[in-house]
Amino acid sequence: MELETHLSKYFTLAFTHKSMSLEMREKLAINSSATLKEFLQTIKTHCPNIKECMVLSTCNRFEIYASLKHNTHANEQKNALLKILAQNKKMSMSDLEKCVLMNTDESAVHHVFSVCSSLDSLVVGETQITGQMKNAYRFAFEEKFCSKDLTRLLHFAFKCAAKVRNLTGISKQGVSISSVAVKEALNIFEKERIKDKKALVIGLGEMAQLVIKHLLNKQFEVLILGRNAAKFEDFIKELEEPKKVSFQNIENLNAYINAYALLFCATSSPHFIVQNRMLKETSFRRFWFDLAVPRNIEKPVFNNIFLYSVDDLEPMVRENVGNRQESRTRAYEIVGLATMEFYQWIQSLEVEPLIKDLRELARISAQKELQKALKKRYVPKEYEGNIEKILHNAFNTFLHHPTIALKKNAQKEESDVLVGAIKNLFNLDKSTTCHAQNLNLYKCEYYEE
């Protein structure tokens, strides 16, 4: 059921690992701030009925979260966004339509909460997605593509994710794409009887850092190839065994690419970093893990190189998270309750400023009449304080029942009719007692850290 028009109309479009192939997700992926800003600006320019917008782009999903103007048809916005994506990413509308999942209103809120709580992830319970959503929100907020509506939504999503983590055991086992990749590499080493536990890691972003930490926990020596030596120096300060990690500039890739049996690649590059022209034949078999989207490794021409992509790891992920069903069920209960609580909170935000406005109107009216009475000497000046207290108590008593009724009805869909009628009766339509000055109330946890 669609909520009445005084509430924000939330809307999501999602392309995920469940509905779209890796090859297609590569085309949608956005890996730079400049590209993301340009894409959001295109939406703002060509979709005037979208009030606020943000984009979440990860290796397993590309999602658009938006709030729509009142009386806007969601299907029209869906078609407009798919058209923008088709033109921007040089993809066919029919391919996009087959893979897209659209949600509106409560379903959209439930979807955002589920994604943020890692219930929709390839690795259920992984915590990386919450940080990715915070970064996506922060960017859209700072670039002024989102404001009150999405701030409220994301604030609640982060609270929901924290509650899921704290009240279930869904994140305790620490399974992630990076941990599954390293575990598979370890299995390969045992089967291949490779004794020299050395690995080459290309990249130093969040995914690469997680891989490195998992490798070190399994007693590997790691050579990192990257572009930023200062970032490497900061990173090794976090490590318990920094001596097992070394760094070389990625310009030296040719010197190392054929020397390691084990390679992990996870960068934000939109192009292949490891290319066939760099490869030479080796006497040993090689096992490469490409954890990037778009992929960083060109399909090898040599038969003794075995390449694993993110999607290739999915069966191993399912095997590792099979015993989380009970936690997952509990987590969905929390998300369902959070969705209800979110709408109750949103509806109460419409009522609270109205209650404040009514009380302020009563106070001003009482004070105005008291000053008239004092001026005309109907009452002595020395009684002013006592009369103010009497009037204050009187209008509090008068407004007590309406206040209770407003708060009670705030959780009902017809509350907008009641709110609108009261605003009209008391000429409060132009009141600004809440929204702008209280925007900080709706800011997400990111800004509270």
From Swiss-Prot:
Belongs to the glutamyl-tRNA reductase family. Its EC number is 1.2.1.70. SUPFAM superfamilies: Glutamyl tRNA-reductase catalytic, N-terminal domain, Glutamyl tRNA-reductase dimerization domain, NAD(P)-binding Rossmann-fold domains. The active site is at 59 (nucleophile). Pathway: Porphyrin-containing compound metabolism; protoporphyrin-IX biosynthesis; 5-aminolevulinate from L-glutamyl-tRNA(Glu): step 1/2. PROSITE patterns: GLUTR. The record marks 111 as: Important for activity. Keywords: NADP, Oxidoreductase, Porphyrin biosynthesis. During catalysis, the active site Cys acts as a nucleophile attacking the alpha-carbonyl group of tRNA-bound glutamate with the formation of a thioester intermediate between enzyme and glutamate, and the concomitant release of tRNA(Glu). The thioester intermediate is finally reduced by direct hydride transfer from NADPH, to form the product GSA. NCBIfam families: hemA. NADP(+) binds at residues 203-208. This is Glutamyl-tRNA reductase. One of its GO terms (molecular function) is glutamyl-tRNA reductase activity. Disulfide bonds: none annotated. CDD domains: NAD_bind_Glutamyl_tRNA_reduct (cd05213).
